Amino acid sequence: MNTSVTEFVIPDALSVTITDDTLCVDLTDGRTISVPLAWYPRLFHGTVEERNKWRFIGKGHGIHWDALDEDISVEGLLLGKPSGESQASFKRWLNTRGN
């Protein structure tokens, strides 16, 4: 049986746009990935100000929100992976915010 290996090159993030219900990330290969904000509960429950204070990590391999303690990788976005945070962890975080 022959198998072939396909190299999967992960592009870097160029820009991030967040609306009330969508996270959009423009990539260096020309694609734009849009996912439901509900996939990332910390972003969903964050304020507009908190959502807009992001920075690239790993030279564009990911995005970090300091105030929300959230990290999202470009690879995870491309693979369609929502947040892997447990409900218990998220509830603890939400309780620290007084929600």
Where are these regions (language model features)?
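Motif-centric detector for short Cys/His coordination patterns
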Residues: 1-99
